[in-house]
Amino acid sequence: MARIAGVNIPTNKRVLIALQYIHGIGQKSARDIVTKVGIDDARRVNQLTDAEVLAIRETIDKDFTVEGDLRRENSMNIKRLMDLACYRGLRHRKGLPVRGQRTHTNARTRKGPAKPIAGKKK
């Protein structure tokens, strides 16, 4: 298994698919990396040479924010919104949908399981 950006990449998959196992790299980013390094899309990870794996590593380190750094950046952005006490920050703080979805019905994923109200019958 090749280890890139702290993630063990599956060896039997194609390079494009295997790179997407890294948090922060999707289809387009994986394709950009492969073209920049000059690797064929159809090649599998176990067919890569050490030099190619090293080139992929360097490209990712230089051009992309991935894994822990990306997670930290996202959480810091949310924390900043909460500290500003703007509308989006308040919605994050209350655990409600942030992007304008309705909450009268639905939004159960964000709000958690329904809480029973005492004295109310169906």
Swiss-Prot record:
Residue ranges the record marks as coiled coil: none
A GO CC term assigned to this protein in UniProt: cytosol
UniProt GO MF annotations: rRNA binding; structural constituent of ribosome; tRNA binding
GO biological-process terms attached to the record: translation
Ranges for region Disordered: 95-122
Keyword Glycoprotein annotated: no
Protein keywords: Ribonucleoprotein, Ribosomal protein, RNA-binding, rRNA-binding, tRNA-binding
HAMAP family: Ribosomal_uS13 (MF_01315)
UniProt similarity note: Belongs to the universal ribosomal protein uS13 family.
Record note on quaternary structure: Part of the 30S ribosomal subunit. Forms a loose heterodimer with protein S19. Forms two bridges to the 50S subunit in the 70S ribosome.
Described purpose of this protein according to its UniProt entry: Located at the top of the head of the 30S subunit, it contacts several helices of the 16S rRNA. In the 70S ribosome it contacts the 23S rRNA (bridge B1a) and protein L5 of the 50S subunit (bridge B1b), connecting the 2 subunits; these bridges are implicated in subunit movement. Contacts the tRNAs in the A and P-sites.
UniProt protein name: Small ribosomal subunit protein uS13
GN (gene name): rpsM
